[in-house]
Amino acid sequence: MDKFVKLTGVAAPLPVVNIDTDMIIPKDYLKTIKRTGLGTGLFAEARYNEDGSPNPDFVLNKPAYQNAKILVAGDNFGCGSSREHAPWALLDFGIRCVISTSFADIFYNNCFKNGILPIVVSQEDLDKLMDDASRGSNAVLTIDLEALEITGPDGGSIKFEVDAFKRHCLLNGLDDIGLTLEKGRSIDNFEKATAASRPWA
């Protein structure tokens, strides 16, 4: 998993509340267990017209936001059914950070496990960031995970909080497998000690 220390990129505004996982990645895209290629299905029902052509009115299809790295979204983002394909699709599209006033718990935790930083802010701060994100190609935010700070295009900053363990994992690029490998020496020592004390096992 790639480390997340500091991210600077265009932020796309998506002022819609209760965006569920089916909206993030429709069920038609859940047949694969590969993490790559799902970016094409991200927000598919909103991004594409019935004939499969891009919907020019959807924010991520607009030229200024096609390479967005940050999503500023409405309340209760990621609600609905549990599907890890949702953060996979966001990540495959290129989005490494989602900012909202609240997230569904399972989606929130899945983001950290897949290298995405979900940030919870107040409604007042979200309104400010949504306004910043509406500036098109000038909607550049910097997310500093070490400093726990968001810096807007006007230089103003907003502080945020993240669980210390989750922050450690993102800063060091540690997913569940990485965390296990980090304890490799301790595991080896335990197995050797067990083999010596219980040779019959």
Swiss-Prot record:
Organism: Sinorhizobium medicae (strain WSM419)
CDD domains xref list: IPMI_Swivel
Name this polypeptide is given: 3-isopropylmalate dehydratase small subunit
Role: Catalyzes the isomerization between 2-isopropylmalate and 3-isopropylmalate, via the formation of 2-isopropylmaleate.
GO molecular function, one term: 3-isopropylmalate dehydratase activity
Biological pathway: Amino-acid biosynthesis; L-leucine biosynthesis; L-leucine from 3-methyl-2-oxobutanoate: step 2/4
Keywords: Amino-acid biosynthesis, Branched-chain amino acid biosynthesis, Leucine biosynthesis, Lyase
Coiled-coil blocks: none
Catalytic reaction list: (2R,3S)-3-isopropylmalate = (2S)-2-isopropylmalate
GO CC terms, sorted: 3-isopropylmalate dehydratase complex
Entry superkingdom: Bacteria
Enzyme class: lyase
Subunit and partners: Heterodimer of LeuC and LeuD.
One Pfam family cited in the UniProt record for this chain: Aconitase_C
E.C. designation(s): 4.2.1.33
Similarity comment: Belongs to the LeuD family. LeuD type 1 subfamily.
GO biological-process terms attached to the record: L-leucine biosynthetic process
